[in-house]
UniProtKB/Swiss-Prot annotation:
This is Dimethylamine methyltransferase MtbB2. Its EC number is 2.1.1.249. It is an enzyme of class 2 (transferase). InterPro entries: Dimeth_MeTrfase_MtbB (IPR012653). The gene is mtbB2. Keywords: Methanogenesis, Methyltransferase, Pyrrolysine, Transferase. Catalyzes the transfer of a methyl group from dimethylamine to the corrinoid cofactor of MtbC. One of its GO terms (biological process) is methanogenesis. Pathway: One-carbon metabolism; methanogenesis from dimethylamine.
Amino acid sequence: MATEYALRMGDGKRVFLTKEKIMAEIEAGTANAADLGDIPALNDNEMDKLAEILMMPGKTVSVEQGMEIPVTHDIGTIRLDGDQGNSGVGIPSSRLVGCMMHERAFGADTMELGHIDYSFKPVKPVVSNECQAMEVCQQNMIIPLFYGAMPNMGLYYTPDGPFENPGDLMKLFKIDKAKESMEHAAEHLTRDTVWVMQKLFASGADGVNFDTTGAAGDGDMYGTLYAIQALRKEFPDMYIEAGMAGEMVLGMHGELEYDGVRLAGSWPHEQAPLIAKAGANVFGPVCNTNTSKTSAWNLARAVTFIKAAVEASPIPCHVNMGMGVGGIPMLETPPIDAVTRASKAMVEIAGVDGIOIGVGDPMGMPISHIMASGMTGIRAAGDLVARMEFSKNMRIGEAKEYVAKKLGVDKMDLVDEHVMRELREELDIGIITSVPGAAKGIAAKMNIEKLLDIKINSCNLFRKQIA
């Protein structure tokens, strides 16, 4: 009897497949992506590599040593303190505690602060509260800390917002009015997002994470692109990450363009240059998981799309890898075996510069991804590499080289806890364990500024406060 390997379906259910069946699923998945996106399918060596990863006997797998990448986040601390029947585990804790847990306990390379409703529009009435939370977090933390939220243009339509719902108008065949409503909503999305981030950046935020860009279609992406453009013009040093909602931008409007390119129907490799043109530092491409297909099919398809996006992108790519995207099953508690295999494949085959850790419980998401692929933050040098990707748009190889040179170590040492523990204490750039007298928070970041020859926003704010 042929050997069968334990894989997953797109909904997380375990399934057993032979090597021949796995290869057939991989071929079908990559062919599907190649056909839809008009991009190259994976070659024989890449398909063999993917099959090898999927058939590895261990429950968890990880990238080869030296291939680790920094991680960013969607939903921030909500995966800890949130309790809405999805992936939040309902631990009563402050957002400061949640952010510091990610930095000190999970080994995150970056982190983000976010409102419980996690959209820009609901932040407006409570922006002062968000600014205070950001200031307190920045005073205590070392890793880059973003403000994260969804553009979520749907909130601008009735009954939640001021503009008529385009879906209702389309049902009445009022197509022009529907388009007009989307255009107005996009303008308000841009305005609100810029206003919120003006306040947060003035409070020390390292930058912004636009999560699920394009969720309401091309109007949503249109408004977000112009928000990025405006923020980049006003704040040249702001870290900006733009992650997508889906693999293809839905043409709800159908005629909106950015830089002369129609947004509707664009795939990850076509979205990347637009995100870069607008002024983002990092692009977060997405590939949706099909719950009725195997993990072999889903992962092959996702790696094919993301590999093409990485090659087409002028800026670093942090693939979105929460539940239901990036070849990961659609399950609130994502299976660790599936998560770590997807993480490894994205790094070693697609060549991503980082991973945006998305929705899922703490064990299934940040812990699994960081164990499989992450640089472990201030346990080593993950925060430093992440800062170079965002401050200078460096791809992963260049960022590692730059940081290694500044530290006077080999690139392999950047993830070596033994080397970096001693070096971080010697340079006083922040360490993960509590040592009396060692630089923490702003003090550590000021030393990082000197080391990497960059400016950090929270340090600039502190200097203004004591001037």
